[in-house]
């Protein structure tokens, strides 16, 4: 039996002023999956990713047309509170961005505190659960009150994942989360994705096609603002329907 849709993009276009950066994208995402967006630089994959939690609201001149449905509700509806929506759709950026003046513990629970949660025992439970979910607990359990900036780059990125997990998002967006990390740290985060999809749904932008093939259930190939192909990862990489996809995944351009 096919699982229900969690996210459905319908005729989504994104503009910066008069320039159309993403063109009429239609894309469905099912719960409990890892979904990779691939394509050359400037193809629209990150632009589309940022639309899924309304980050373009913060960009002067940017606008999004079409519909992005989360559990059947258009996230761009005037009745939707963007702040509340972003608690349902978390984001991990390309470079680790822990809050520099906060401890490891305070970084993880920052989102909960903003919603008014103050109970220390509850915050500690959430911090431990989230750090375990990000495969970081054993490395930092004795350093919770130390500055987050004292962690290594790979640890800081997993801390950012824990911070996103703390508010229990339905979707976790990841914009090239390993591009600034060494191979060992990259491997830890890749290993983590299989466990994370048990508790959330992941959409990851990556320039690394080997990474997309290793970690994702579905792959979407973007090119010059168009969604060229979307399907099961094995199919996209071994038997693509579009010759442009075949040319890209085989390394003939990119």
From Swiss-Prot:
Residues 7-249 form the ABC transporter domain. It is found in: Cell membrane. Its EC number is 7.3.2.1. It is an enzyme of class 7 (translocase). It catalyses: phosphate(out) + ATP + H2O = ADP + 2 phosphate(in) + H(+). GO terms for biological process: phosphate ion transmembrane transport. Keywords: ATP-binding, Cell membrane, Membrane, Nucleotide-binding, Phosphate transport, Translocase, Transport. ATP binds at residues 39-46. Gene3D superfamilies: P-loop containing nucleotide triphosphate hydrolases (3.40.50.300). Belongs to the ABC transporter superfamily. Phosphate importer (TC 3.A.1.7) family. The complex is composed of two ATP-binding proteins (PstB), two transmembrane proteins (PstC and PstA) and a solute-binding protein (PstS). Part of the ABC transporter complex PstSACB involved in phosphate import. Responsible for energy coupling to the transport system. This is Phosphate import ATP-binding protein PstB. It comes from Deinococcus radiodurans (strain ATCC 13939 / DSM 20539 / JCM 16871 / CCUG 27074 / LMG 4051 / NBRC 15346 / NCIMB 9279 / VKM B-1422 / R1).
């Amino acid at each position: 039996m096919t699982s229900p849709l969690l996210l459905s993009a319908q005729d989504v276009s994104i503009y910066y002023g008069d320039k159309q950066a993403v063109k009429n994208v239609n894309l469905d995402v099912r719960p409990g999956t890892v979904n990779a967006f691939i394509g050359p630089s400037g193809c629209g994959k990150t632009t589309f990713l940022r639309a899924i939690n309304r980050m373009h609201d913060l960009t002067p001149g940017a606008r999004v047309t079409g519909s992005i449905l989360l559990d059947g509700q258009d996230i761009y509806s005037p009745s939707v509170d963007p702040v509340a929506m972003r608690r349902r759709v978390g984001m991990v950026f390309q470079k680790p961005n822990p809050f520099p003046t906060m401890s490891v513990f305070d970084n993880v629970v920052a989102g909960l505190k903003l919603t008014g949660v103050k109970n220390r025992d509850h915050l500690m439970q959430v911090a431990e659960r989230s750090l375990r979910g990000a495969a970081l607990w054993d490395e930092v359990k004795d350093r919770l009150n130390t500055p987050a900036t004292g962690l290594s780059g790979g640890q800081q990125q997993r801390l950012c994942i824990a911070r996103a997990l703390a508010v229990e998002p339905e979707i976790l967006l990841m914009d090239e989360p390993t591009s600034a990390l060494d191979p060992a740290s990259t491997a830890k985060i890749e290993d983590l994705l299989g466990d994370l999809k048990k508790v959330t749904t992941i959409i990851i932008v990556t320039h690394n096609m080997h990474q997309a093939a290793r970690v994702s259930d579905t792959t979407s190939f973007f090119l010059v603002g168009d969604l060229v192909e979307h399907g099961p990862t094995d199919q996209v990489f071994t038997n693509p329907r579009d010759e442009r996809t075949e040319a890209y995944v085989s390394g003939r351009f990119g």
